[in-house]
Design a protein with these regions (language model features):
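Conserved N-terminal beta-strand and adjoining loop/helix that marks the start
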Residues: 2-23
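Conserved Nudix-box catalytic region and its N-terminal flanking loop in Nudix hydrolases
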Residues: 18-58
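Intrinsically disordered, low-complexity, charged terminal extensions of DNA damage-control enzymes
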Residues: 61-62, 94
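Active-site-adjacent beta-strand/loop module that shapes the phosphate/pyrophosphate-binding cleft
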Residues: 11, 73-98, 103-107, 123, ...
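Nudix hydrolase/Nudix homology domain
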Residues: 29-34, 98-134
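A short coil-to-beta-strand element that immediately follows conserved catalytic motifs
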Residues: 62-72
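Short loop segments at secondary-structure junctions
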Residues: 20-22, 91-95, 110-112
Length: 134
């Protein structure tokens, strides 16, 4: 599909947190689908600034900026939009808890892949192929 046939580009950043072969996912209030935690950047924000802000808003933890490392950039068509997700790993401080905008947190293995959007599935595939996601 060419860019002319796809609507807007949704440019996001996401935090990849894997423990025991599972990746942390969040389901926002009012949504049925789980996402890798993160979100859209505000004007003038870097990926790192967006990541730190979004994770603090969604999960009430503080990412350690000096530990932010790129994982990869993934792109997929989702409905009428093209979604680009820049993924990063980072250490954090605090206790993982869902904020008021998040209905549920879950640790997903590869078998839960159908419960996430197309762009997240690309990351799931790569992590599974590398043996990081069970």
């Amino acid at each position: 599909m060419t860019d002319e046939l796809v609507g807007e580009l949704i440019d996001t950043v996401a935090w990849v947190l894997i423990e025991d072969g599972r990746i942390l996912c969040a389901r926002p209030r009012g949504k049925a689908v789980f996402y890798i935690p993160g979100g859209k950047r505000e004007p003038g924000e870097s990926d790192e600034q967006t990541l730190v802000r979004e994770i603090a808003e969604e999960l009430t933890v503080t990412l350690v900026p000096a530990t932010v490392e790129p994982v990869g950039v993934y792109e997929a068509v989702d409905g009428a939009a093209r979604v680009r997700m820049s993924c990063y790993r980072a250490e954090y401080r605090g206790e993982l808890r869902a904020s008021s905008e998040i209905a549920e947190l879950a640790w997903f293995g590869y078998r839960e892949r159908p419960q996430v959007p197309p762009v997240d599935r690309l990351l799931f595939d790569e992590l599974h192929a590398a043996g990081a996601l069970r």
